């Protein structure tokens, strides 16, 4: 029999999704959000949800939204932040540093030293309880980032005004500061009034608050998550698309849900 060729006859695209693709997606989400793989019962439950129509955006969104309600989500995110910006400092190290500062306070009559180390303890206690405060909704993710850079551990890693300012831009904005930004940031760090990112400030706290309310910071959050989940930089269109609602809503977790519920993260077209 002869084969019959029909001109312009193109078969429809194959829209099926292999089971292994669904299972891999589920495990990727668990690892990214909870820091561990799904156990068999969890895998089966998620598979049943997604198997019926893995191309359904709403089904993937529901799956990811359930994951970010898990207590391990907050612990994993805190561990990621501490690993990225604080050399992986843990709760025991924080508690030990607080104890050292408390001992210094009880060993001196110098009022300046007492006030200095009392302030250091406050900053470390904010870091110590940040995870629970964030989980309880008492602070935003931006507050969490400010606490992360406002303690003696971060200061020791990024010692001095120049290193500190550069670290903010490189860690959270994915670029080096301009000469003007660097000089203004250094002035604020050293307690001298200056105009930084078009806003007036006079000290290190102002430096932090101005930076973490800037467009550069929110665009950097988008870049951070794209590199974490997609291993690539976002396009300029994607930066604008995702940073705008982030600036308006201040909802970091919502952005994570959008990215992990995407077809790109699942690995389908």
Where are each of the predicted segments found?
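Composition-driven recognition of low-complexity segments enriched
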Residues: 1-269
């Amino acid at each position: 029999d002869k084969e019959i060729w029909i001109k312009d006859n193109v078969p429809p695209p194959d829209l099926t999704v292999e089971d292994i693709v669904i299972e891999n997606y589920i495990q990727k989400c668990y690892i990214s959000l909870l820091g561990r793989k799904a156990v068999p019962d969890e895998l089966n439950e998620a598979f049943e949800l997604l198997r019926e129509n893995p191309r359904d955006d709403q089904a993937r969104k529901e799956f990811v939204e359930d994951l970010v309600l898990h207590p391990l989500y907050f612990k994993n995110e805190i561990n990621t932040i501490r690993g990225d910006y604080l050399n992986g400092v843990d709760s025991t190290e924080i508690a030990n540093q607080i104890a050292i500062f408390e001992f210094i306070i009880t060993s001196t009559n110098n009022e300046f030293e007492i006030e200095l180390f009392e302030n250091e303890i406050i900053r470390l206690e904010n870091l110590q309880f940040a995870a629970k405060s964030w989980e309880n909704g008492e602070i935003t993710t931006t507050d969490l980032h400010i606490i992360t850079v406002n303690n003696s551990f971060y200061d020791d890693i990024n010692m001095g005004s120049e290193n500190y300012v550069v670290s903010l831009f490189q860690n959270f904005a994915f670029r080096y500061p301009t000469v003007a930004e660097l000089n203004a940031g250094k002035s604020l760090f050293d307690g001298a009034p200056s105009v930084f990112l078009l806003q007036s400030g006079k000290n290190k706290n102002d430096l932090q608050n101005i930076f973490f309310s800037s467009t550069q910071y929110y665009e950097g959050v988008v870049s951070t998550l794209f590199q974490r989940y997609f291993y690539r930089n976002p396009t300029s269109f994607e930066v604008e698309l995702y940073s705008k609602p982030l600036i308006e809503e201040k909802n970091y977790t919502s952005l994570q849900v959008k990215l992990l519920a995407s077809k790109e993260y699942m690995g389908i077209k």
